[in-house]
Structures are given as structure tokens and as C-alpha cells.
């Protein structure tokens, strides 16, 4: 087979055609041609740079007098022949009696393969005329009328046309699923019947294709044959390397004018365009619900049919993919086959290990163009960008609350259902997320793998370390629109907002007391149960909350990491420092609705309110005095003790 040339992947327009194109179409042409050339260079096919590419790179018009003269006398350009030929008399004579053209310095690589209907410059009949001229031994050319795509087999053209009609003539009667191509139906049957011919001896996972099986084996042996020349990063699949390279090139050739968003793949801009048009071409006939992606429709169908073929007998949970069942089994077995060579930490998924390794390297290749913040994963950057746009596309049908991530919506839904499938074997605590359970387990093991380089403090969660670092940097990215107050955590801002709204969603069934946060309600409940699971090893004192134990431990160490910049006074808790700062600023955020008096602490406001209600909760046993707050009661006790002595 003759090696691929630049002309085989190029496109040619006549001068008249070029002048008919608008600026966007001309730019698209430039981008496509440059991308084709880069792909050939990457594959090691193109050695010399064509003149056309030089013109395009310099943003010049792809027309010179010399080039225009050549196109004005069009050659017959056909991928079935090794050279270009001049037409003589008519097309038949040209193929029977051909004369090679000489272009001087302009090599064959500099010529472009035309892909318009008049590709071979046949005035009558287009491709059909060319097909008639070809010998019977040569393969014929078939073209799609809608998108002008070329095929060398009539069956391929037919298969392609079915995609435009969206018809799915091949139906699987067993489950009622339909396909537009017969080969897709055959492949689906294999999945359903579980015919997996290739089984992995390492983990027992089975595959129905040898190529997929070969790829999978690389996970266990750690083979990474594809290396990035830019940074030396190794990948076990060629597609992963190609995706990785986009980080460095930052080439986003496909731009949407409506929102200025750019993409490096044409398929991505096609998917994105549907957001603006509001088009939902994938429709469910049973419930008339429509979706903008076929994958979303497939997922939705499962809700109706409950098509879950793979059930785990241990817990009764079922899955619609065998790979999901295999992954789920590991939760029960506790198996963690993927181990980090750096620190020895083990994981139940290879992707989790890959993600963990970045902690050691410190690599953050994904940077936000808006604020310069860098991330370890592209998904984290995508999520971060929503902070700038404020977009929240995922809405809860139950209460109308919107989220910027689908995972956050899934997590939120469990509030309505009350489902908590992940339970701690040590203490019985249940969570609605596996990640929460994993983090919770660190309390029992006391493992703290995440260490602050600034002060040496260690944490059992990476998110806690990130939040802690803001103490040193002073960064407070979350600002209240109501009063302008800023916070270093989004959750604290959410809680703070409830001060303005007065919302207290979490109510104690025992005494009716309501709270802003669920954690405060959980903490409060321990007052009724008397439970104190957190014990100090130093003195044996027990607490009903882990944070109270952490605060107590500072008494033994004497550590006071939070220092006031104004007067130098140090505190063992950040909240104490915040409270102290109000002495300097004069800030009094807690105001009495009854008389307007303001306080710098919420506890002082609570005590003050009792003046209006007449409530006196603190009464000494030895005298008739009574007090509305603990501080006055404590002061009275000290005075009483002094008199006695």
C-alpha cells in the first residue's frame, strides 16, 4: 500500500469558491488544514512542510499567482493514482492516455485533494462519471448527498445514511433495544449473553474482545508504552497520550461565537451547541421525555425498565453493567489491589491510584484562564469554572434546588429519600456517600496522610488541608452578598446566610430546638443521649464531639497558633481570634430585634433576650439571686466564694 501523503487529507477550493466563503468558514478551513498537517507530523508521515501550510501558519491568503494558475488549469486529482494528470479532450481520454504534469518546485505534497462533487473536474456526472471511467478492478467512489462524505463501499454509504434518518431497523427482541447498524446489535447481544471469551487471571474480569483485554492487562503489569515528549509522562493507551498532549498545545480550534467557548474537538462543539439551541433530539416514546444526548436517554430508559442484569446476591444490589458489579464487589471484599509505591496506600480502583499519585508529584496541569488557579484533574477545573459563570444546570425535581454538578444533585436527593447505604463497621454510622464513609474511617484509624508544609499540621482529608491552608494565605473566596462578609469555606457562607434568612431547617424531635446545620443537630442530640464517644488520652475526659476533643487537647500542649496581628495576643481556636478581633474593629453583628441593642457574640445576645422574656435560668442554691446568663452567674459565685474566705 502506498504511504499516505498530505494531499490525501487536504481540501481544495477554486478561487471562485474561496471568495464565496465567509470569514468563519475560511477560518474553519485554516484550522482543519493545520490540524490535518499536525496529525501527519505526529504520525511521522510528513517530512517537508508544504507551502500551503506555511501560508496558513502566517495567516496569509492560501493563494499565490503560481498556485492560482495551477488551479485554473485543473488536473484530474484522484486518490486511486500515484500522480496527477491533465485532462485531454474528455475524461475517458484522460484515463486512457495520461500525461504527467510538472509543477517545478511545487511537489505533489503541496497539492490538495479536492473533496467537492467536481473533484476530478468532470463537468458531467461528478463521481458517477469518474466511476464509469475506472477499470472494474479499481474500487468505486460513493458519496453521501447530505454531508458529501466519501465511501469506497456501497454498504458503508448505506450504513452511514441510516444515521441521518435516525431509524433503528435492527431490534433485539429480548430487551426491546434497537440499533441502526447490524454490527452494533451483534455486539450488544454478546454483552447481554455474557459471552466473554477473554478472562483476566489477575482479577477475574472478562472481555469479549482481544484488543480490550490487551489494554486491560497493562493496568496490572504497569506497562506504559506511550510517552509524552514534552514532559515525559507515560500512558498505557495511545488515546490517553493524545488527550494529554492537548494540555500543552491548548489548541481549541472550534469556537462558539454565541458564548465564546472554544473546543479542541468538533464533536464537543456539536454537543455544546445543543445547549444554546435547546434541541432535544433523543426522545423516549413511553413518557415523551426528550434529551440532548443519546447517553442520557439510555440512562433514563433504565429507570423505566429497571434493566439490571447483574445482581449481587450478597446485598441484592443490581447493576446494568458487569463492570459496575465487579467494582461493587470490592466494597464487600475490602480488596485493594492498586498500591502506591511512594507511601504504600492501597486503592480498589486504578483511577483512584492515578489520582492519588498526583499528591506526591504536586503536578497541576489544568489552569483556570479566569483567575489562574491550577488543578490536578480536568474535571476539577471544569467544576471550578462554574464558580465564575454561576451556572447551575442540575435541578432537583422534589424541591427545585439547583446544583452545578450532577454528583451534588445525586447527593442532595438522598436528603429526600433518607437513604444511607454506606455504613461504618466500627461504630455503625451510616453515610449517603462512599467518600464520606472513607473519610469517616480515618477517625478510627487516626491516619492523617495530608500534611501542611507551612506549619506541619496533618489532616485525614485533603479538603481539610486545602481549607487549612487558607488560614496562612488569608484567602476568603466566598463572600456574602447581603453584608459583604467573606469566608474561606462555601459551607460556612451557606450557614452564615441563614442568619439573614432566619432559616433553621434541622429540628430536634426530642425538645423541638432548631438549628442552621445538620452537624449542630447531631451534636445537640448527644445532650439527650449522654453519648460521649471522644475521649482524651491525656486526662480521660470525654466529649460528645470530635472538635471539642481537638480544642481540649490544646490545653495540654499549650499551643496557640492563631495570633492577632493588631495586638499580638494568641488563641488556641480560630473562632476565639475572630471574636477577639471585634474588640479592635468594634463590629457587633448580633442585634436584638426587640430593642436594637447589638453584641459582638451570639451568646451575649441570647443572654440579653432573657431580659425581655423575664427568663432567669441560672439560680444559686445558697441565696435568692438569679441571673440570665452564665457569665454573670459565674462572677457571682466567685464573689460569694471570696466573702466566705
Curated annotation (Swiss-Prot):
Quote the subcellular location field of this record: Nucleus
The molecular function terms in GO held by this entry are: DNA-binding transcription factor activity, RNA polymerase II-specific; RNA polymerase II cis-regulatory region sequence-specific DNA binding; zinc ion binding
Q: Where is this region: Disordered?
A: 626-645
Q: Name one GO cellular component term.
A: nucleus
Concerning PROSITE patterns, the annotation shows: KRAB, ZINC_FINGER_C2H2_1, ZINC_FINGER_C2H2_2
State the superkingdom. Eukaryota
Give every KRAB domain span.
Answer: 4-75
A Pfam family this protein belongs to? zf-H2C2_2
- In residue numbers, the zinc fingers (C2H2-type) are 142-164, 198-220, 226-248, 254-276, 282-304, 310-332, 338-360, 366-388, 394-416, 422-444, 450-472, 478-500, 506-528, 534-556, 562-584, 590-612
Q: Keywords of this protein's UniProt record, alphabetized?
A: DNA-binding, Metal-binding, Nucleus, Repeat, Transcription, Transcription regulation, Zinc, Zinc-finger
Q: Can you cite a GO biological process for this protein?
A: regulation of transcription by RNA polymerase II
InterPro entries the UniProt entry points to? KRAB, KRAB_dom_sf, Zinc_finger, Znf_C2H2_sf, Znf_C2H2_type
Similarity comment: Belongs to the krueppel C2H2-type zinc-finger protein family.
Q: What the protein does? A: May be involved in transcriptional regulation.
Q: Name it.
A: Zinc finger protein 681
Tell me which species this is from: Homo sapiens
Its gene? ZNF681
